[in-house]
Amino acid sequence: MSPVAVVTGGASGIGLGVARHLAADGHDVAVLDQNGEGADAAAAALRAQGARALGVEVDVADRHSVEAGFARVRAELGPVAILVTSAGIEAFDPLLEISAERWDRIIAVNLTGTFSCVQSAVPDMLDAGWGRIVTISSQSAQSGAPNMAHYSASKGGVIALTKALAVDLARQGITVNSIAPSLVDTPMARAAEATGDFPGVDVIGPMVPLGRAGTPADIAAACSFLCAESGSYITGQILGVNGGMYIW
């Protein structure tokens, strides 16, 4: 049986790119997403390519939903060996217009959702003495971004959580790393463009030092490396897949 990889936010964008790449790598893949129909469609497409895949409707901000989703993955695919936490929401609001409710929602999905998924996956990895966790953070957590205090803070929390987890779990054979993208051409980015929250992928893309926006496949390739044996001596690191937009 192939190792089971869980990808949250796997119905579209970065998560879908990661799910496709991990399936191509030979993993069984569970696509978790709040959009249940989208998760099912993504899993069906993976199965059509010969992969063993499952779509599960999960709201990462709801702890009970997360636990139920992981229980289904175990029952239908097996224990979790790889977790990629791509589920997240963007937000663009001036500082003084960020309501408490808006703040709480961003933190609940992006940070607490990541934490809940990790807690649900790690017991299987501890039993196996092996695991890979890749969180998806953001360049905005490293450099800051206008009108994104809530989003940047949530992703900064993901970075701090990643480092703490790496220290906690290293002796158990589990690596934990984060990928911090910059501009990536996804449905979420295009939706923000359509509402006028930022100038647009085609406007910002040429400003990237490498001359283009990133793609989900760019992020997925880095994720695949971190999940493979070739990445086994890397943990606690923040990998900027950003076209040179942020250099540390």
What do these predicted ranges mean?
Residues D93-L96, S143-A149, R171-Q172, G211, ...:
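Active-site loop immediately N-terminal to the catalytic Tyr-X3-Lys motif
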Residues P94-L95, R102-I107, I204:
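Substrate-binding pocket helix/loop in short-chain dehydrogenase/reductase
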Residues V118, S154, T162:
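Active-site helix of classical SDR
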Residues P123, V167-D168, S232:
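Alpha-helical segment proximal to the catalytic Tyr-Lys
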Residues S138:
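Residue(s) in the substrate-gating loop at a strand-loop-helix junction
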Residues S143, M207, S224, T235-W248:
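Short C-terminal tail/terminal secondary-structure segment
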Residues A170, T175, I234-G236:
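Short, small/polar-rich loop/turn modules that mediate ligand/substrate recognition or access, typified
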